[in-house]
């Protein structure tokens, strides 16, 4: 029985390892143009600023002669109050830990403006920068947008280090200065049919080398009718490498992707904060002059990436912890940090790939006990032209599934983690890979739209309900492209609907009310801190807000709350107790109403998992569902529509079947909702069956194999009956009477009278006064006549 339980555990674990999806990003193509940032001016009296300054920064773009103005303010969201940096030694042990002082990092956000010929300024986009040097000759890096075309500002030294062979060369101007390139300056890959061609290797985010990717049903047509056919086997024989992409974990059907395009239902109405952790490995740290510079670059990357999440999902990405490893890579990777090694240093030969780094880093992340949304490993290594890799739909997931084995390249560990390689547009790679962790699939491009494995354009996010190709304009584009600064309406609808359906976790997302920031109390940072009634941001952001005074962060006269930051606030007054602040999503998720004396909406409460909510339906993660219903939702289009049922009731991977073909198993990188019943009396949790017991496992196995059990029971019963019958028959035979010789009966004579005997009886001795000696129980001789006894004793016949 112990072995049986162990076997079930192994099978369940192995099955769970085919439920998630990884996504990988590839390096950009060559640059057609690059500009130098000329005449930068900080518009303050002394040309000096500090980390908490509000100021304008202007400069020219040579040779375009365009004047740009960045209107900037501190971005206090990028660092949490207790943000810290931990310095590790080469063995992975903690050397020291320091608090990240907000005043040491001049990180800013704001708006980009262009100057017309008339001299008037027009706002054309957003800006996120980090200032390295102020004064008369400032030096900064970051990104800003002009009409949705991103402009990347980088230092000359960084460009030289990461310059592609066919990028424009630089002149011999000495010293450090700033360069700029646009997304539209990147050479675009040309494609003809299914063959992609470019001067550089194809820049894409394909996810076809790890088992999680290969097991994705949403990249394949229906399976051929074979017993126990799996997506993995079908993939190995029918789909080429370049025809794949990832699916982002638990993906709604094609109808759902189209129906939710542009919908923000499910995303937070008020600002939420996602705390993240970042680790810099030795190869990444080695690209900087100091550990301080490495830390600043990480902050700059998160600062730039956060803006697209704030605009799309009302979620800020905030650094909670940074771990920095020494720049000298160890000769042999430590068991504590196996991901920290040279790019081509893998035991047993070959290269230590980006997938290897993700696996080992995920195992490391799984041991962390924090409440971070995810962790990112920053590295300077790539695999061919791949520069990013992430597990999909792992937001807020704690722990790890699986275990990487250095001797087995196919072994995987899945956690809330990703890997990002250092490039000159790292922030985009970071934002793209984080999008997969939030559960986004790729946007459709021309290749996916023409792929026969993508019927009805259901395996990617289409541009509209009637148009497939998104033309490479958005953050989840599978290949590099220009003007990528936002998520597509389809990606927004998908992520928000996943939050609403609870197919991704959001428990780690915190509110921005009562959050302590690294800088302490700062009015105007958009976070309501101790001592503040409200905080709508700077004066530009607070335009039209009549509830909050942006200068004092106090309610205006007569106001009780702030409509922009409190869900139970209407017209600066508390909403009535009959006001619904969070609607019901079904029988298992009751609506929440305002209290009438607070601006906050009560906590979201849903029915207990396992409660009955309909015929053959139970609550799971706030949804009224069943295993069959989830199969119909996720794989119905590929199997049998509304007739689709679950293949079994044991595991937590979505495995379905057509009742007319019960031996054909349809599966993919899908998991049942948390709280869905699974084998052994357990429930699904992050794709694994937890809470099962050995007794229930045995009972469940019996119920799932009734024909076998009945056959064995009948056979054993018959054998038992035969054994009992045999015993009864044997006992009956032993009790039957039989003719047999009777043993002689010796009787002690009483005063016998010997007639015809000569002398005394045989063997007799003369009596003595002391009594008689014992008799020897010897019968009389056969020929001797029997003795005569007095009385009428019956005679005994000896035979």
From Swiss-Prot:
Probable zinc protease. Residues 1-23 form the signal peptide. Disulfide bonds join 396-496, 449-460, 581-601. Gene3D superfamilies: 3.40.1620.60, Collagenase (Catalytic Domain), Disintegrin domain. The keyword rRNA processing does not apply. It is a single-pass type I membrane protein. The chain crosses the membrane at residues 708-728. Keywords: Disulfide bond, Glycoprotein, Hydrolase, Membrane, Metal-binding, Metalloprotease, Protease, Signal, Transmembrane, Transmembrane helix, Zinc. It comes from Arthroderma benhamiae (strain ATCC MYA-4681 / CBS 112371). Residues 24-707 are extracellular. GO terms for biological process: proteolysis. SUPFAM superfamilies: Blood coagulation inhibitor (disintegrin), Metalloproteases ('zincins'), catalytic domain. Residues 776-789 have a biased composition (Pro residues). The active site is at 433. Residues 729-799 are cytoplasmic. This is Disintegrin and metalloproteinase domain-containing protein B. Its cofactor is Zn(2+). Glycans are attached at residues 33, 227-228, 314, 408.
């Amino acid at each position: 029985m112990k072995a049986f339980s162990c076997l079930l555990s192994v099978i369940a674990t192995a099955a769970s390892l085919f439920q998630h999806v990884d996504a990988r990003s590839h390096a950009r193509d060559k640059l057609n143009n690059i500009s130098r940032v000329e005449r930068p001016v900080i518009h303050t009296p002394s040309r000096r600023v500090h980390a908490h300054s509000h100021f304008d920064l202007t400069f020219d773009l040579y040779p375009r002669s365009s004047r740009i103005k960045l209107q900037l303010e501190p971005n206090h969201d990028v660092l949490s109050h207790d943000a810290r940096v931990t310095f590790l030694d080469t063995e992975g042990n903690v050397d020291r830990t320091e608090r990240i002082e907000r005043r040491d990092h001049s990180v800013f956000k704001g708006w980009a403006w262009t100057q017309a010929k008339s001299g008037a300024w027009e706002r054309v986009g957003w800006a996120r920068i980090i200032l390295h040097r102020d004064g008369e000759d400032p030096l900064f890096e970051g990104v800003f947008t002009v009409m949705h075309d991103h402009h990347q500002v980088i230092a000359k030294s960084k460009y030289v280090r990461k310059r592609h062979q066919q990028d424009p060369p630089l002149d011999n101007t000495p010293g450090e200065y700033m360069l700029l390139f646009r997304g539209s300056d990147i050479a675009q890959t040309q494609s003809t049919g299914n063959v992609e061609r470019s001067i550089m290797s194809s820049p894409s985010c394909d996810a076809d080398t790890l088992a999680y990717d290969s097991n994705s049903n949403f990249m394949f047509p229906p399976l051929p009718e074979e017993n126990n056919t799996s997506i993995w086997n079908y993939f190995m024989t029918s789909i080429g490498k370049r025809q794949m992409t990832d699916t982002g974990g638990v993906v709604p059907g094609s109808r759902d992707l189209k129906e939710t395009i542009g919908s923000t239902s499910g995303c937070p109405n008020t600002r939420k904060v996602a705390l993240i952790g970042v680790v810099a490995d030795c190869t990444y740290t080695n690209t900087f002059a100091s550990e301080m510079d490495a830390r600043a670059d990480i902050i700059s990357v998160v600062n730039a990436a956060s803006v697209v999440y704030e605009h799309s999902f009302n979620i800020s990405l905030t650094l909670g912890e940074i771990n920095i490893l020494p720049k000298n890579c160890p000769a042999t990777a430590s068991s504590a940090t196996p991901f920290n090694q040279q790019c081509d240093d893998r035991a047993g030969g070959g290269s230590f790939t980006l997938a290897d780094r993700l696996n080992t880093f995920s195992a490391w992340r799984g041991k962390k006990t924090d409440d971070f949304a995810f962790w990112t490993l920053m590295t300077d290594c790539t695999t061919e032209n791949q520069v990013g890799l992430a597990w999909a739909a792992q937001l807020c997931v704690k722990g790890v599934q699986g275990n990487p084995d250095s001797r087995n390249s196919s072994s995987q560990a899945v956690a809330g983690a990703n890997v990002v390689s250092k490039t000159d547009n790292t922030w985009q790679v970071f934002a793209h890979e984080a999008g997969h962790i939030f559960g986004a699939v790729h946007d459709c491009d021309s290749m996916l739209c023409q792929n026969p494995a993508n019927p009805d354009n259901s395996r990617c996010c289409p541009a509209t309900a009637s148009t497939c190709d998104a033309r490479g304009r958005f953050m989840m584009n599978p290949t590099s492209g220009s003007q990528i600064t936002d998520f597509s309406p389809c990606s927004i609808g998908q992520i928000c609907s996943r939050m609403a359906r609870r197919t991704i976790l959001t428990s780690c997302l915190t509110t921005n009310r009562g959050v302590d920031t690294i800088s302490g109390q700062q009015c105007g940072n958009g976070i309501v801190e101790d001592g503040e009634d409200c905080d709508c941001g700077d004066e530009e952001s607070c335009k039209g807000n009549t509830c909050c005074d942006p200068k004092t962060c106090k309610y205006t006269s007569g106001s009780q709350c702030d409509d922009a930051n409190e869900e139970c606030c209407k017209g600066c007054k508390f909403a009535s107790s009959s006001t619904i602040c969070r609607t019901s999503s079904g029988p298992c998720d009751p609506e929440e109403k305002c209290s009438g004396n607070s601006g906050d909406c009560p906590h979201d409460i849903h029915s207990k998992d396992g409660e009955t909510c309909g015929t053959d339906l139970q609550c799971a993660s706030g949804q009224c569902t069943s295993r069959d219903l989830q199969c119909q939702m996720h794989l119905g289009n590929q199997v049998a529509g509304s007739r689709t049922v679950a293949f079994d009731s044991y595991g937590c991977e979505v495995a379905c079947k057509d009742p007319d073909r019960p031996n054909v198993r349809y599966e993919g990188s899908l998991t049942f909702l948390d709280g869905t019943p699974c084998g052994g009396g357990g429930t699904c949790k992050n794709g694994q069956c937890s809470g099962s017991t050995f007794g229930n496992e045995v009972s469940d196995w019996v119920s799932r194999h009734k024909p076998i059990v009945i056959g064995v029971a009948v056979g054993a019963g018959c054998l038992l009956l035969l054994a009992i019958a045999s015993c009864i028959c044997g006992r009956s035979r032993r009790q039957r009477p039989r003719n047999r010789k009777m043993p002689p009966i010796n009787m002690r004579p009483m005063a016998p009278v010997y007639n015809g005997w000569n002398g005394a009886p045989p063997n007799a001795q003369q009596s003595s006064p002391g009594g008689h000696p014992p008799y020897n129980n010897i019968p009389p001789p056969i020929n001797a006549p029997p003795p005569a006894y007095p009385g009428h004793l019956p005679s005994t016949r000896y035979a």
